[in-house]
Amino acid sequence: MVRPPSARSAVPGVGRLGLLDPTAAASLRELGWDNVESIPVLWALSRAPDADLALNTLMRLREALGSDWQRLDSAIRTDTSLRGRLFALLGSSTALGDHLVAEPAAWEVLRRGDLPDRDELLADLLAAVQATPEAGPHAGPMLFRAGIAGPEAVALLRCRYRDQLMLLAALDLAATVENEPVLPYRVVGRHLTDLADAALTAALAVAVARVCKDQPCPVRLAVIAMGKCGARELNYVSDVDVVFVAEPADATATRLAAEMMSVGSQAFFEVDAALRPEGKQGALVRTLDSHLTYYKRWARTWEFQALLKNRPMTGDLELGREYRDAVMPMVWTASERPDFVPEVQGMRRRVEDLVPAELRERELKLGRGSLRDVEFAVQLLQLVHGRVDENLHVASTVDALSALAAGGYVGRDDAANLTASYEFLRLLEHRLQLQRLKRTHTLPADDDEEGMRWLARAAHIRPDGRQDAMGVLRSEIRRNAVRVRRLHAKLFYRPLLEAVVRMDPDALRLSPDAAVRQLAALGYAAPENAFGHLKALTGGVSRKGRIQALLLPTLLEWLGETPNPDAGLLAYRRVSEALDEQTWFLRELRDEGAVAQRLMIVLGSSEFLPDLLINAPETIRMFADGPHGPLLLGPQPEEVARGILTAAARYDDPNRAVAAARSLRRHELARVASADLLGMLEVPQVCRALSSVWVAVLDAALAAVIRAGEAESGEPAPAAFAVIGMGRLGGMELGYGSDADVLFVCEPRPGVDETKAVKWANTVAERVQRLLGAPSTDPPLHVDAGLRPEGRSGALVRTLSAYQAYYGQWAQSWEVQALLRAHQVAGDQELGVRFLHAVDKVRYPAGGVSEDAVREIRRIKARVDSERLPRGADPATHTKLGRGGLADIEWTVQLLQLRHAHEVESLHNTATLETLAAIEKAELLAAEDVALLRDSWLLATKARNALVLVRGKPSDQLPGPGRLLSAVATVAGWPNNDGGSEFLDHYLRITRRARAVVERVFGS
């Protein structure tokens, strides 16, 4: 038989309550809480951050209260809110628990369910020493004289201060025990500041009574709060930094200041005046003029950073306001000082270095991802931008973050995340300090599970279903530290800052004279035109305009270092206007320094890329760095090719299929060209990527046309169709300005008439050429079949057998040579490979080509050298047909292939560089000669690609020294400060040596 639970068994035992102290059960009996009526009290006690500590302190409080315990016990049982405040307080703070035991009647303070306002705090602290308003010539609203000024004054003030601190802590902690409102961090910080102001006003009242005796106060003394107190974001336990201003700054003023500090430090907290001019070596009290003289002549940068948070606190508030009004203009111009940013950043690093390595991960204030990271970053941004934006003239860190976000200086999400992390870390700091009312910022050690568990409960951290409260706390600490460090790096060290502070103050406002002057200094040839672009970019009062105004000083300087800043700024305006609706664009430029700088390099160097980027804007986001390096290097050509084929295959309409393929080609072209221009890719990588995307688009177009034809006729294609790449396409060595040289080959399906098959294939080839060559927003794709048998007079498409017959009977030497580059690139793979096998007999003949063929090739080469060079071209600097240019190297390689491929199988290769490697391995040329040919081919290809990137259109001729050559040299990766002359000398030297090798091969 199951017995019903008894009344006694319904009462939770100490184990269920989480009480570990061996005396806990006896203590509960002694309190009279081991019964059914006390169950709500017991469960509330169990929720205290440290239930054992709370119970032990309650036992001491019961003893201290004596017969008055019954009143408190009754209140605990009936007033849920009071119970929550009391248990949370006693389970969180041994120091405030000790205070309550020492002053047991003070529990009545906890009956109050709201915070006293600033005036109530002031009245309460002043009443403790019976202070009254000071009379006399220097009377003011914050100057009082204590009626109690003897040694007992300190004890009275300490007790009253602790009462108020206890009430705040109880209200702050109550939500951990009962369902009470959570006090926002900013409310706690402001209340602690109001309490500190009231406390030091009372301390000053005692000082006036002690120093001035029966005489009216003979001086004006202003107490200026600095640091966290000045910013109204004080901790529970914190030094209060002050500066004193007096008129006159005589012995009486000094004694008043010293006495106030002494009383305050004994009764409340450490009062520190070390931020005064000259620090602890300087005079404790100065006149306003003395302060200003020091700040104008001697102050260091960090002192202006400290002044950012100054606030008249007590004493002569009018004098305090005069001080603030006089020093703040100097604060907002501090960023104009030489080396301002490096000095501030260096100071932050030095502070970080002071933290012992073993404590850096536990240090909330000074370690990595700590409170100081946030504060330094925010203060630096305020000082840099506050000189032209009064909205940033705020003192508290959280308010400053809000203002920075509202002004567009930081991202709204970044500001929100940083604020959340900052408030979380400050919450932990508050809880740690409350424990013993000690100034600490260090988290418990990892192996201190008891300490971490207490902190989790005190911070109101709850289990999340996967981890207990302690595990959640550890995860949150790590997550917030990483987030702070990441955002700190974006804000504090981002390269925008140093550039912005080097600009004239007017330049940030972009006033006409300042902007034109600055633009000319930065290398703009037409600064007035450039200024017009700036006005267009920053016009209006929109958030985008403000962000542009923030970015432009840095962007202009980066553009000024490019070959053509004027064109770059125009391009930037075009890109900005085209992406006006893309909210990510300006955010990326502002928050990712690499994106902004790389974009400026690209726009100021290339006429090829701006249109591509406007039509493929997502490429700009790839200018950022990822975890494994630049995002531009992420996609692989094979992946891009598969994506193009997949995208095109989704459409039945060839026009839409080709449009999809060309769109992806546009993105890939923008990516490759950007990475190339930024020096991230080597020449072979560029050529392979460009060739791969060309092949994919060609293959996609061919498949779409065939698919549409089959759908239209309702029958399978009457022939297999293959595209053979020739020239640079066959060698997978395309440049930006290269056409695609191809041959079209078909083979009728079984039972299909050849005439019908060829006619169909011609229709397919013509449509592919037409689709790919149609005008579009990306560079056109010219498919050139001019290398086919009989040239442009011959049939556009032939069957495989027709090709075999022609090459077997009629092939001329130049056609044989052209076949050395033949490679299957699109269409029917099996047919393409059969074509290659068929022409192998022609291009790699047994015994090599005849001497007559060699002589014919030499004759044609000589004619090309003399006749094909365009009129007016310089044979020394024409990258394709000039001396030591691409044609020279490729003809040399091909001649060696024709003569030796029958015996050296590795020469059966369509790629120039790979064939050169085979030539070297077979010792057909000396390694030194091969190196010269390779270097010349790479340099000529690089220069030819650079010409297209710079000019925006195909070109083979290097210009003479000047701005254009300088741009080509820069894009080609050549250090350049001489109009490109050094690059040109290098080009001539390399190609001249290669030409000597070419002449030896063709002369042998």
From Swiss-Prot:
Residue span of region Adenylyl removase: 1-496
Source organism superkingdom: Bacteria
Record EC number: 2.7.7.89, 2.7.7.42
GO biological process: regulation of glutamine family amino acid metabolic process
GO cellular component, one term: cytosol
One Pfam family hit: GlnD_UR_UTase
Stated role: Involved in the regulation of glutamine synthetase GlnA, a key enzyme in the process to assimilate ammonia. When cellular nitrogen levels are high, the C-terminal adenylyl transferase (AT) inactivates GlnA by covalent transfer of an adenylyl group from ATP to specific tyrosine residue of GlnA, thus reducing its activity. Conversely, when nitrogen levels are low, the N-terminal adenylyl removase (AR) activates GlnA by removing the adenylyl group by phosphorolysis, increasing its activity.
Protein's name according to its UniProt entry: Bifunctional glutamine synthetase adenylyltransferase/adenylyl-removing enzyme
Region feature Adenylyl transferase, mapped onto this chain: 502-1004
Record keywords: ATP-binding, Magnesium, Multifunctional enzyme, Nucleotide-binding, Nucleotidyltransferase, Transferase
Gene Ontology molecular-function annotations: [glutamate-ammonia-ligase] adenylyltransferase activity; [glutamine synthetase]-adenylyl-L-tyrosine phosphorylase activity; ATP binding; magnesium ion binding
UniProt keyword Cell membrane, yes or no: no
Family per record: Belongs to the GlnE family.
Catalytically driven reaction(s): [glutamine synthetase]-O(4)-(5'-adenylyl)-L-tyrosine + phosphate = [glutamine synthetase]-L-tyrosine + ADP; [glutamine synthetase]-L-tyrosine + ATP = [glutamine synthetase]-O(4)-(5'-adenylyl)-L-tyrosine + diphosphate
Entry cofactors: Mg(2+)
Listed InterPro entries: GlnE (IPR023057), GlnE_rpt_dom (IPR005190), NT_sf (IPR043519), PII_UdlTrfase/GS_AdlTrfase (IPR013546)
Species assigned in the record: Nocardia farcinica (strain IFM 10152)
